[in-house]
Structure formats: structure tokens, C-alpha cells
């Protein structure tokens, strides 16, 4: 009796439930579509793709190298260390501007790669951010102390580094960064823009505990890096015909503060706090549209520091490169 009473009070119909789900989906899709086509751009220059769903397959490779030199208690030191290149494969999808992706690192799955790296990019019409964090024990290279050169192998030095660049796009109505780097927009006509930016690079390299245990007589070295830069640059999207898009961006910033330090066996040497030096942020991309549905391309982002000081000199080069193919569905 109770079941019969509940069925009378709360009638259930599979068709009615399906209708509710369909109405909710239609409403959500309408909201997403309105939001998707509400553009801050001049549509003579930048438009949204017509497909509701964009699928993309992407291969990426990243690398990082650091050169340093300095003098501590009359002992001259120099080094060149680089990480193993990280290769990932990802597949992603974006529906009306909402995106998700999944990445795998084949070398890590096989146990050959223990490093960790996170790269984040945010592209709006006015403001853009590129950020990366890397933790690596795959550093290798040479360290020289006076006349003695030591070969550093994997697991003998540790690196942690954080890079971030934020910039403002002045010609934000006609110049679109997203068109070149995530294909969420299409640049219809060539345009460029001046940029104002802020950059920071920070982190350290130090000899690992494993090396200290295996070679206790070797010098214990730590290199601390921190640069804050302010500057400006220019970016340009060149549209060739209706199929090609080429982007080149250069954003140099001037170092206004640093905390660079070299430590050998507990003795430290600091760089001048307000030394005049530079950080360079470069971008390049090529996108080819086979049709309104299919596209492919290459892109790269690099962050370089050029810091020269009589006490401590540090050059860092962090880069990431992508190759991708994609398709748009459901016009």
C-alpha cells in the first residue's frame, strides 16, 4: 500500500525524466553559446570558430638549462647544467569554451623520468599569463672549481624553479593571442599590439644528498636565482590568405630586483641587488587551417634570463614547444 501511495504522490515517467534532462541541457547549451559568441574583439579581425566541439591531439617537449659563474674566497666557479627533455602527449577537448585535457609522459610510465613539471597558460583579450614550475633531479653537465672540472650525472644535483610572465595587450580589440596558441579564436586579418609585462624567475640548484654521501670531498654547491623584471614588447599575428597564421612575440623586461646567490661549502657570494640586467620572453607559432574544420600547427614559448654581475652571473633558458592537430565538430 505504501508503494502504491508513493507512486500516486510522486509519479515517475522515464519519458518525463528524459524530457527534463533535455530541457536542462538545452538551457545550459544556450547559456554557453551566448557566452561563447559574446566577443570582446572587433569581428572584422577576430571571430569564434563555428564548431561547438574542438578536439586536439598535441605533443610537447620542454627543457631547461642554467649557466652560472662566480668567485667565492678567491676560488672561481662556473657551471653548465641542463635537465633531461620532457616529452608528453595529450588529448583535449573544448565545448563552447569549456576545455579539459589529459596528458601522459611515456618515459615516466616506463620509470625513466622522475621529474615533475607544470605549465599553465591563461589568454584573455587584455591580460595573458604564462607560468611554469619544475622540480628536477635529471640535471647533468659540468662544474668547474678553479682548475678542477667535475662531471655531474643524473641524481647528483636538484633543481626547483618557478617562472611567470604576465602582460597587458594594448590593441586587445584586433590582436588575439588565443588564435595562435590555443585556437579558441580565428584571426581573420593581420594585426599586432604593444605589450606591457612583468616577469619573475626564481629557484635554486644544489648538489644532492646522494652525491654528498658518495663524494664527501667534493664541494657542496648551491645556486639561488631570483629576478624580477618590468618591461614591454610587441606581438604580431600575420594572416596569409585564409589558411596561414604566423605569430611572433618578444617581451624583454629589465631586472629591477634580484636575489642571486652562490654558496660553496657554506661560504656565500651575493649579486648586487639592483644590477641592471634583462629577462627575455619569446613566443612563436604557426597555424595552418586545412579547412574550417581541420587545423595543425607548431608553437614555442621561451623564458631567458641574462644576468651579469662581477660577483655572480646566472643565465637560465626555459622553453616548451608544441606540435598539434585538431578538428572542429557540430556546427
List where the protein language model places each region.
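Outer-membrane pore/translocation modules
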Residues: 119-223
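Extracellular loop and loop/strand-boundary signature of outer-membrane beta-barrel proteins
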Residues: 75-78, 103-105, 147-155, 182, ...
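Transmembrane beta-strands of outer-membrane beta-barrel proteins
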Residues: 53-57, 100, 118, 127-131, ...
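Repeated loop/turn-to-beta-strand initiation elements of outer-membrane beta-barrel proteins
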Residues: 97-103, 126-131, 172-175, 244, ...
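Outer-membrane beta-barrel "beta-signal"
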Residues: 164-166, 317-331
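Residues that define the transmembrane beta-barrel architecture of outer-membrane proteins
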Residues: 51-53, 83-89, 94, 112-116, ...
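Residue-level signature of outer-membrane beta-barrel architecture
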Residues: 93-95, 104, 122-124, 168-170, ...
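Outer-membrane beta-barrel pore domains and translocons
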Residues: 58-62, 94, 103-107, 134-136, ...
Amino acid at each position: 500500500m505504501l508503494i502504491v501511495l508513493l507512486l500516486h504522490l510522486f509519479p515517475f515517467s522515464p519519458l518525463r525524466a528524459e524530457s527534463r534532462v533535455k530541457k536542462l541541457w538545452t538551457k545550459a547549451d544556450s547559456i554557453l553559446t551566448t557566452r561563447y559568441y559574446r566577443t570582446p574583439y572587433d569581428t572584422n579581425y577576430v571571430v569564434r570558430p563555428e564548431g561547438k566541439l574542438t578536439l586536439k591531439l598535441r605533443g610537447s617537449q620542454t627543457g631547461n638549462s642554467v649557466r652560472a659563474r662566480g668567485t667565492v674566497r678567491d676560488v672561481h666557479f662556473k657551471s653548465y647544467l641542463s635537465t633531461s627533455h620532457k616529452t608528453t602527449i595529450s588529448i583535449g577537448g573544448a565545448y563552447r569554451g569549456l576545455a579539459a585535457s589529459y596528458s601522459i609522459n611515456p618515459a615516466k610510465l616506463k620509470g625513466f623520468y622522475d621529474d615533475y613539471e607544470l605549465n599553465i597558460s591563461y589568454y584573455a583579450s587584455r591580460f595573458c599569463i604564462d607560468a611554469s614550475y619544475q622540480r628536477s633531479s635529471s640535471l647533468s653537465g659540468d662544474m668547474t672549481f678553479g682548475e678542477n672540472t667535475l662531471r655531474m650525472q643524473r641524481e647528483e644535483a636538484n633543481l626547483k624553479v618557478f617562472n611567470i610572465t604576465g602582460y597587458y595587450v594594448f590593441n586587445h580589440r584586433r590582436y588575439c593571442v588565443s588564435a595562435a596558441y590555443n585556437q579558441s579564436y580565428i584571426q581573420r586579418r593581420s594585426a599586432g599590439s604593444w605589450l606591457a609585462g612583468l616577469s619573475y624567475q626564481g629557484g635554486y640548484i644544489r648538489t644532492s644528498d646522494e652525491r654528498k654521501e658518495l663524494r664527501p670531498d667534493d664541494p657542496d654547491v648551491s645556486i639561488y636565482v631570483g629576478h624580477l623584471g618590468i618591461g614591454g614588447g610587441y606581438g604580431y599575428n600575420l594572416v596569409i590568405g585564409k589558411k596561414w597564421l604566423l605569430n611572433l612575440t618578444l617581451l624583454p623586461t629589465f631586472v629591477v630586483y634580484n636575489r642571486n646567490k652562490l654558496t660553496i661549502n657554506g661560504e656565500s657570494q651575493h649579486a648586487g641587488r639592483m644590477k641592471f640586467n634583462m629577462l627575455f620572453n619569446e613566443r612563436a607559432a604557426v597555424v595552418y587551417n586545412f579547412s574550417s574544420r581541420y587545423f595543425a600547427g607548431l608553437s614555442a614559448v621561451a623564458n631567458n634570463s641574462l644576468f651579469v654581475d662581477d660577483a655572480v652571473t646566472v643565465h637560465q633558458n626555459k622553453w616548451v614547444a608544441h606540435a598539434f592537430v585538431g578538428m572542429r565538430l557540430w556546427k
